[in-house]
Amino acid sequence: RDEAVAALGFERAYADYRELLADPDVDVVSICSPNFLHHEIALAAIAAGKPFWIEKPMGVSAAQSREIAEAAEAAGLITAVGFNYRHTPAIERARQLIRDGRIGRVTNVRCWLIADYGSSPEGPLTWRHSRDKGGSGVIGDLLSHGADLVQYLAGRIEAVTATSAQFIPERPIPTKAGIGHTGWEVSDELGAVENEDWVAVLAR
């Protein structure tokens, strides 16, 4: 830990998130753990009175996400979900043009989100592919960005029809964990993927 602090230039590091939340010098928290830890850490941050930025999806289920949102609101805390694409200059400019009436009535928005980190069947079976630990697959990981952007630009979605599929049903089981999407070592043994890796949505 001391080596990481020195190498990365941080003032301090913590071995446990509870230690961080107990520090009175910490003003705001970024919750960027794997999905299955979001709920636990967010509720602890709320109990500690710490405002937070939380990665999406907020929880592995709608019930978990709702509980976090309601608890934060009851505590009067400022929070944000990690929909970072809405703050890119192009999106902010498009939103302003729409608000100013410069492009007329918006009748159609098309949004594609493609990520290659899950495209290879040789990629490792990680927590992202587990219903218990990852929750939804591409719906929570990528579609959530699309749904946020569409509503940020054009208003609330009122009706949805959708279909999803799983194109890679099995993946190699890791023998050594990596960080993020890289650095994983895998075995020849395969494990089942539990969530979807493709989804298409038509929304009004």
State each model region's role:
Residues 85-192:
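Predominantly a Rossmann-like dinucleotide-binding segment in NAD(P)-dependent oxidoreductases
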Residues 196, 201-204:
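Active-site beta-strand termini and strand-to-loop segments that position acidic
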Residues 21, 27-30:
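N-terminal Rossmann-like NAD(P) cofactor-binding module of classical short-chain dehydrogenase/reductase
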Residues 10-17:
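Conserved SAM-binding strand-loop segment of SAM-dependent methyltransferases
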Residues 12, 27-28, 108:
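Short, Asp-centered acidic motifs that coordinate Mg2+ and/or phosphate
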Residues 1-6:
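NAD(P)-binding Rossmann-fold cofactor-contacting core
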Residues 32-33, 153, 195:
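Short, well-ordered coil/turn residues at beta-beta hairpins
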Residues 28, 34-86, 101:
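Beta-strand-loop-alpha-helix segment that lines the small-molecule cofactor/substrate pocket
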